[in-house]
Amino acid sequence: MYKRQYLACANSVWAFIDTETGRPTRPQPKDVQLYGVEEPLDIPYEGRKIRLPEETDDLEAFPVRKHHIDTNEHVNNCQYVQMALEFLPDDLQIAQLRVEYKKAAVLGDMIYPKLSEEADRIVVELCDEQAKPYAVLEFKEEI
């Protein structure tokens, strides 16, 4: 007999987009029924915004390459995580990952990473040339 245990859990916020206007819209009941609605998991829910560190180290910039790009012709969300992982210590045991996506990077854009190691977390900001983040990632070893 198997005991039901969670290996991982996640919380995400999505937008329902009208494909004709490109603008967010309220989903109709038929749209929601396709995915189903369940009770929220009993997990800690963090705020939507990641607190930016006061001090960061600038790391070496790199270009967005073809393998980062998805079918929407911008960097795939999981690629931002892969980029950030390159700057973490090899022995880091990640217990919690939070990602705040700010704007889409496209092929040829330069990524300017910033790193901050604090007592309880590591924050990686993946920024454009004006230091505006494409994505902010927060890694914790303990929840």
Enumerate the language-model features and the residues they cover.
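Hot-dog-fold acyl-thioester-processing enzymes
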Residues: D18-D91
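A conserved acidic, glycine/proline-rich C-terminal tail/linker
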Residues: F87-E118, V123
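HotDog/MaoC-like acyl-thioester-processing domains
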Residues: K3-K49, A105-L107, S116-I143
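A structural signal for short, well-ordered beta-strand segments
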Residues: A10-W14, E60, L97, Y101
